[in-house]
From Swiss-Prot:
GO molecular function: ribosome binding; translation initiation factor activity
Function statement: IF-3 binds to the 30S ribosomal subunit and shifts the equilibrium between 70S ribosomes and their 50S and 30S subunits in favor of the free subunits, thus enhancing the availability of 30S subunits on which protein synthesis initiation begins.
Gene3D superfamilies: Translation initiation factor 3 (IF-3), C-terminal domain, Translation initiation factor 3 (IF-3), N-terminal domain
GO terms of biological process kind: ribosome disassembly
The protein's name in its UniProt record: Translation initiation factor IF-3
Record's subcellular location: Cytoplasm
Source species of the chain: Rickettsia prowazekii (strain Madrid E)
Keywords for the protein's UniProt record, in alphabetical order: Cytoplasm, Initiation factor, Protein biosynthesis
A GO CC term assigned to this protein in UniProt: membrane
UniProt-listed NCBIfam families: infC
Amino acid sequence: MYLFINIIWRNFISKNNLPKANREIKAKEVRLVDENSEMYGVVNIREALDMAERAGLDLVEISPNAVPPVCKILDFGKFKYESKKRLHEARKKQKVVVLKEMKFKPNISIGDFETKLRKIKEFLKDGDKVKISLWFKGREILHKEVGHELFKRIELALEGLIKIDQHAKMEGKQMIMIVSPDIKV
């Protein structure tokens, strides 16, 4: 039962995403554009369907919200293929920005500091944003200036590679700064 409903639902969704073609067009009159992109003007739907049939092509509703709707004579299979291909290319070009996090402590050693900086540089080269957080434990929170100094060291070490989205600020027991890769680099 579930499989049957799933198949029907998938077909319903896929058909609604496509423009109407041929006999699915319900308008009485349409603004017709032929296969050579020449405007014919407002034509009766029967006449438009006959012209498409004579050309061996389909009548496809391009702009359904216009009054009267705009229809074009073209190969519907080729149209579906090209629109699917354009959608695939657009998805390929999209870049998903990921927020990575690097945690520091106020009394970090030099070696650990440099290792974490190298990792931050890798994240930035991949085009990801980086959330740099500094965790205070116990009485360390009384010395916030240590945190500000650490963030200054990070800024100086990454100068030219980063653009600061959010400057260092306190959130509870942690200090946070968000950086992203500098577009110029």
